[in-house]
Amino acid sequence: MHIEIRKRGKRKLYYLAHSFRHGDKVRKLRRYLGEDLTRNAIELLRQKAEKSILEQASSLRAIRDPLHTILSSKEMELIKALISKGDIRIKHLSEEEWLKFAETFAYNTNAIEGSTITASEARGIIEENEWPPERSKEEISETYGVAETIKYVRKTKEHISLSLMKELHRIVFSNSKAFAGKFRAPGIEVAVTDSHGNIIHKGAPQRQVIAVLRELVEWYKKNRKRYHPIVLAAVVHNQFERIHPFQDGNGRVGRLLLNNILLKHGMPPVNIELKNRQEYYQALRTYENEGNLRPTIELILKEYRELRKLLKRM
């Protein structure tokens, strides 16, 4: 940001100006500070003006929740610019690369939810059927379950449905959870807490779960040809996580749904890494609190770059 001075007769008018890229264009925002100001007055006025400019710039960069608002042409331009810069050029995966992806995805998606199985142990479980003696049978079965669900996602022709959601959950948790493949029963409400026990998210009331899931399915059917696949996948994933239809296991099913949408549109799969867990959670919070999809899109593009690096090392 910088100070601009404009002269009108004998008067000097002071502005705080800020230039930034918005989509494929450069935007400039200004705030009027006053006339004939001293240096101290400029500094005092600058602080408030700077905050105002940053808030406006942030709102301009935001991508609204398409579930409730049709995206504007400027937002569509912004998405196009983000994706073009994201460089997601990844060839279709070979069977060897799919195996590597399944192992990496199974490790990370379970670790995000607290699994203690390491990356090398996940590889041994999936490739060699090796059971680490110090790990629980539940963690081991969920590692198998995620890998099997990746196979299912590759084969199914379904994009999204309530039966698909339940089937993904059933495959992952069939040997670890009694409620595998079943939405929350009456009286079961869920909340997500942080490490201090503070509630950071409450799922939809149990009695509303079926209705809001159907709304999501209908939105996807209506908009599947309107928006870029990454936008579709991000909305489906984020909205699914907001609803939290299962008693447990929503994060893993949500990330599988994310990949299912991408694959059905000819896109490569994406792996949300454990090291990016906080960024992932923050993207979900920003979507829930502000209706801003941009952080989720940026994270997906970031993970595509990481996937390309992983495949190059094979």
Where do the language-model regions lie?
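FIC/Doc superfamily catalytic core
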Residues: 1-248, 252-314
